[in-house]
């Protein structure tokens, strides 16, 4: 279950006290259901704050950060505070997780690590692009996986192309990549499963992978916010020569 306040307004619509009461009431309800009706029910509760501390990366002391600190102080460990990585178009890094934890620990020990909602392969700001790659720009190698309570994606409006990111992120979360080659291998493997759900490549899965090689880069405006994802890498020199 998730309660989402994101984009409600600057700083969110509701006060920290109101949200703490809501989250604790819902937690009590979930625990009651688990004890009386549904023994396998999970009581984890995701909560996404209104502004998700985009601009300050959890390093300041403004009202956004103070609100999240109060949520940490007033709720149990079952509440997962959802963030986007210190900015709207964030990535999965140990550095942000540590800043988040330490900022919450200033008010209550121990701190709490974030649940990351990464805006990838989301193409809301680049609707003329399909983001069918860019994994190594988002899913950072040698991450300390214990420092995130979870990682979820914001997919594109196009469901089928989004499966490339879903597959690669699933591989990453199952076993954090030690180097970018592991990420590239996961990306390469994705198309066999997307196309026909086996580990054996086929003519159609190879064709899908070939198309995807050239459908990765975002529009210039989006690339400036997120870091540009390279595409057509294997023919990059030939393209440059042709354009010149």
Where are these regions (language model features)?
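C-terminal functional modules
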Residues: 178-244
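Catalytic-core regions of glycoside hydrolase
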Residues: 8-184
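Basic (Lys/Arg-enriched) interaction patch that binds polyanionic ligands
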Residues: 4
């Amino acid at each position: 279950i998730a309660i989402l306040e994101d984009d409600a307004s600057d700083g969110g619509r509701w006060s920290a006290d109101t949200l703490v009461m809501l989250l604790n009431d819902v937690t009590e309800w979930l625990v009651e259901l688990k004890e009386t009706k549904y023994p396998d029910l999970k009581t984890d509760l995701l909560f996404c704050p209104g502004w998700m501390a985009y601009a300050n990366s959890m390093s300041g002391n403004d009202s956004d950060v103070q609100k999240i600190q109060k949520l940490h102080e007033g709720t149990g460990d079952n509440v997962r505070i959802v963030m986007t990585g210190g900015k709207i178009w964030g990535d999965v890094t140990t550095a942000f997780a540590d800043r988040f934890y330490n900022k919450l620990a200033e008010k209550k020990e121990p701190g709490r690590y974030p649940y990351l909602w990464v805006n990838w392969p989301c193409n809301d700001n680049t609707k003329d692009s399909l983001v069918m790659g860019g994994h190594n720009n988002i899913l950072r190698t040698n991450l300390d996986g214990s420092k995130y309570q979870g990682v979820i994606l914001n997919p594109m409006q196009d469901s089928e192309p989004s499966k490339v990111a879903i597959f690669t992120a699933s591989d990453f979360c199952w076993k954090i990549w030690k180097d970018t080659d592991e990420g590239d291998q996961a990306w390469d493997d994705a198309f066999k499963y997307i196309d026909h759900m086996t580990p054996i490549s086929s003519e159609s899965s190879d064709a899908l992978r070939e198309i995807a090689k050239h459908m990765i880069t975002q529009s210039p405006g989006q690339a400036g916010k997120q870091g540009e994802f390279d595409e057509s890498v294997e023919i990059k020199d030939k393209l440059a020569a042709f354009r010149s």
